[in-house]
Amino acid sequence: MLFEGKVADGPFPTLAGPGIALIPSALSHRGRLLEILATPQVRRWWDAPDQPEGWPADDPTEPDTVRYTIALDPGRGAEPTVVGLIQYAEMNVPEYRHAGIDIFTDPAVHGRGIGKASMRTLADFLFAERGHHRLVIDPAAANAAAIGCYTAVGFKPVGLMRQYERNIDGNGWHDGLLMDLLPDDLG
C-alpha cells in the first residue's frame, strides 16, 4: 500500500521536470486534487470525484498504484502549487514488463505543456529507473486533447477498445484508445 510516497518497494523520489515536480502523493494533497477532479473538464473523463478515505496516499481499491502529485516548480523555498496527479501501475512479469499510466491536470493549466512535461518526466523514470520496456495509456477515444498530448510525447495508437469504459453517468459505454510508448519513441 502507498503511505506518504512509500509502496512495498518504495519510497519513491520526487521527480523534477521542466517547470514541474512530481511529488509522491500525500494525504495533504487530497483537498486540492479532489477540487481538480470535480471540475467539469476533468470530471467528464475521470471516475467520480469521491475517492476512498486516505486517497491519494493510500487507496485500498488500487494498492499497487503509485501516485505522484503534479506541482508547478516554484523555485527555492516556495511551496509548490498542486495542479494534478499522475499515477502508474506495473506489470512485473518479465516477459511483459510494462506500466500503465493515468493523468489528470487542472483545466487552468491545460495547453501550457504541464501534462507533456509530467508524462515525459514519469516516462524517463519508468524506463531508466524501473526498467520498463513499454508504457501504456488508455484515454477515452473521444478525448482529443488527451490523445494530442500523449501523441506529442511519443505514444502511438495501438487500437480501439470498443465499449471499453462505462460512462460517468452509469448509462452506456464509451470506446477507449489503447496507446503505447517504447523508449525510442519518447519525444
Name every feature range the model reports, one short phrase each.
Residues 1-57, 184-187:
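A short, well-structured alpha-helix characteristic of acyl/acetyltransferase catalytic modules
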Residues 25, 136-139, 156-172:
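Conserved catalytic-core motifs of GNAT/GCN5-like acyltransferases
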Residues 44-110, 116, 125, 182-186:
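Acetyl-CoA-dependent GNAT
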Residues 105, 140-141:
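Short amphipathic helical patch at the helix-1/turn junction of helix-turn-helix
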Residues 116, 128, 141-159:
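Conserved active-site alpha-helix within GNAT-family acetyltransferase domains
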Residues 128-138:
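Conserved GNAT acetyl-CoA-binding A-motif
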